[in-house]
């Protein structure tokens, strides 16, 4: 009888130089290394401004999934290497730029509230600043409307205690003084206020309305005030 030949060892039984078994299929390493990017403070202000304009232009007109880093680089007229150096990936570019835009809004709002004591006047000023932002930054409003609610935490300003407290202090003070509705928790009153602004802002931009929102400010504030103030005050 001819001698039987033993079968060669399968790939799963072979060993590599380290003595570990080899696999016929390489397993993908699912571990990810956090991106290390350069501080944004090191980027030239003029370059950052160009990136901001590009982000607002591109993301306002298209779905975020359709935008690429190459498009952002070309529109901003900066190198792709620069984008990766300071941001690392597309999502970080978007969230960082939106944080800068909203950060300026926060600073302006807090500046305008200085020295105003009346609850109604403080609420009026807060609404005016927000609506003025919608009128002057329609592209930013569109970009924000496309950010998933689950991703809002990626925009740092949404966790900015100074900004949130600036909003809440106006409403909390109003409740304590017996001016604003106190039959619901403070956060519900805050949601009513933000929902009013958000809906107005998004629809104003979608409709491409020619007249700015603040052209009807008195009427809009009256609606908001009646919804948030105690009935006996709103009817005065």
What are these regions (language model features)?
Residues 50, 54, 58-92, 96:
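Helix-turn-helix
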Residues 103, 152-179, 187-195, 202, ...:
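Amphipathic alpha-helical packing segments from all-alpha helical-bundle domains
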Residues 1-38, 132, 169-177, 207-236:
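C-terminal peripheral helix-coil segments that are non-catalytic and often amphipathic
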Residues 96, 110-136, 190-193:
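Hydrophobic alpha-helical connector segments
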Residues 44, 48, 69, 91, ...:
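Short, structured helix-loop boundary elements
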Residues 68, 141-145, 153, 179-183, ...:
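Short, hydrophobic secondary-structure boundary micro-motifs
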Residues 133-153, 202-203:
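Amphipathic alpha-helical segments used for helix-helix packing
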């Amino acid at each position: 009888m001819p001698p039987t030949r033993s079968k060669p060892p399968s790939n799963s039984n072979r060993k590599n130089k380290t003595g570990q078994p080899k696999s016929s299929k390489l397993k993908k390493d699912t571990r990810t290394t956090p991106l290390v990017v350069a501080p944004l403070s090191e980027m030239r202000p003029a370059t950052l401004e160009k990136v901001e304009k590009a982000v607002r232009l591109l993301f306002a007109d298209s779905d975020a999934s359709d935008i690429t880093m190459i498009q952002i680089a070309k529109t901003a007229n900066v190198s792709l290497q620069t984008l990766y150096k300071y941001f690392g990936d597309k999502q970080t570019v978007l969230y960082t730029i939106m944080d800068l835009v909203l950060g300026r809004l926060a600073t302006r709002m807090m500046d305008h509230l200085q020295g105003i004591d009346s609850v109604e006047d403080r609420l009026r000023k807060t609404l005016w600043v927000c609506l003025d932002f919608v009128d002057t930054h329609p592209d930013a409003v569109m970009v924000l409307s496309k950010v998933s609610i689950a991703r809002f935490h990626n925009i740092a300003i949404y966790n900015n205690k100074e900004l949130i407290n600036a909003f809440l202090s106006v409403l909390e003070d109003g409740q304590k003084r017996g001016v604003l509705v106190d039959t619901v928790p403070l956060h519900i009153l805050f949601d009513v206020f933000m929902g009013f602004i958000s809906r107005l802002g998004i629809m104003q931009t979608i409709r491409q309305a020619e007249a700015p929102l603040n052209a009807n400010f008195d009427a809009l504030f009256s609606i908001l005030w009646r919804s948030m103030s105690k009935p006996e005050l709103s009817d005065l």
